[in-house]
Amino acid sequence: MPPKSRSTGPKKTQKTRRRDKKNIPHGAAHIKSTFNNTIVSITDPAGNVISWASSGHVGFKGSRKSTPFAAQLAAESAARKAQEHGVKKVDVFVKGPGSGRETAIRSLQAAGLEVGTISDVTPQPHNGCRPPKRRRV
């Protein structure tokens, strides 16, 4: 019995799903600023992420990710993407002890988003995990 020939017809191309533009005038900006990185997520009122950016995503590597300038560029990038979806006003929620907290908030304002309330939602342990040992330099 001869082997079955494979069809060499047209290849099926897989469609990539394009994100449709939503019109969300009011959102929330979540800024997570750690000692190593800064992540900015802009969400709709239900908490679904519209746009995000981080210091590493913007193009910084290593210890430069933790700088305030990297946080500024990350916030500008996230704000630009969010404005394409119609976001004009945001409430800011800041989490973490990093150096890019204030810079990220200022650059959201500079990018054209109106900042409503600013809340610090850094989690505080009620004597939970033991913290890492002190650095000796």
Swiss-Prot record:
Classification via PANTHER family: 40S RIBOSOMAL PROTEIN S14/30S RIBOSOMAL PROTEIN S11
Position of the signal peptide: none
Origin: domain of life: Bacteria
Record bears the keyword Membrane: no
Pfam families for this protein: Ribosomal_S11
A biological-process GO annotation: translation
Ranges for region Disordered: 1-27, 116-137
Function: Located on the platform of the 30S subunit, it bridges several disparate RNA helices of the 16S rRNA. Forms part of the Shine-Dalgarno cleft in the 70S ribosome.
GO cellular component terms, A-Z: ribonucleoprotein complex; ribosome
UniProt GO MF annotations: rRNA binding; structural constituent of ribosome
SUBUNIT field: Part of the 30S ribosomal subunit. Interacts with proteins S7 and S18. Binds to IF-3.
Keyword vocabulary terms for this entry: Ribonucleoprotein, Ribosomal protein, RNA-binding, rRNA-binding
Gene3D superfamilies referenced in this protein's UniProt entry, alphabetically: Ribosomal protein S11
Official protein name in the record: Small ribosomal subunit protein uS11
UniProt KW Ribosomal protein keyword: yes
Naturally occurring in which organism (per UniProt): Rhodococcus erythropolis (strain PR4 / NBRC 100887)
SUPFAM superfamilies cross-referenced by the UniProt entry: Translational machinery components
Family matches, as InterPro entries: Ribosomal_uS11 (IPR001971), Ribosomal_uS11_bac-type (IPR019981), Ribosomal_uS11_CS (IPR018102), Ribosomal_uS11_sf (IPR036967)
Biased composition (Basic residues): 12-21
Similarity-based family: Belongs to the universal ribosomal protein uS11 family.
